[in-house]
Amino acid sequence: PTDFQAVKKAVIAHNIEMVIVGPEAPLVNGVHDFFLANDELKNIPVIGPKKDGALLEGSKDFSKEFMFKHGIPTAKYQSFTKDNLQEGKLFLETLTPPYVLKADGLAAGKGVLILDSLDEAKAELEEMVSNQKFGDASSTVVIEEFLKGIELSVFVLTDGISYKILPSAKDYKRIGEGDQGLNT
């Protein structure tokens, strides 16, 4: 839920002693910061990053910039908006298929397109940035080179001093057999 006042009421009414935030949207919108800034909630532990940390999940463009800045290996990329759409189409021409287009913002797991056709990739880029195929999430689109391999999520708990690595998880995103079809 992103209605933080309603969350506050529920936490107080039910005497909740710890909050574990699962969905990305409340984190990106600053639920952890809301707890820290509120006298009635600031002593309740919240598991989940503050708004600044959640931006790593909430913006693909920010994440890519962060990875490049800190020397973290990642695919070659560029970001585009409707203002530089033609440059985006030209960038697609420099890549080898398949083409990867990612809505910059949160799109409920649906904002990534992997396309084999250059013409289709150009059309989808235009649909994303000009017609907001994924709403505001696709006002900026990250185009990156395709990397073949297994995608894993690694989870780490930290208090800012120490950390604990949790088990990794593989998300089987595609609807069809053989990792084909749309994301689920």
Task: Pin down the residues of each PLM region.
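Phosphate-binding core of ATP-grasp and ATP-grasp-like enzymes
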Residues: 128-132, 147-184
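Proline-aspartate-enriched helix->loop->beta-strand connector
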Residues: 11, 15-17
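Rossmann-fold NAD(P)-binding glycine/threonine-rich loop
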Residues: 53-70, 85, 114, 118-120
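Glycine-rich, highly charged phosphate/nucleotide-binding loops
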Residues: 1-10
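A short, GP-enriched loop/loop-strand-helix hinge that lies immediately N-terminal to
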Residues: 17-59, 71-82
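Short beta-strand-to-turn element immediately C-terminal to the catalytic PLP-Schiff-base lysine
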Residues: 80, 112-117, 156-159, 166-167
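Conserved ATP-binding module of the ATP-grasp superfamily
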Residues: 73-76, 94-100, 115-153
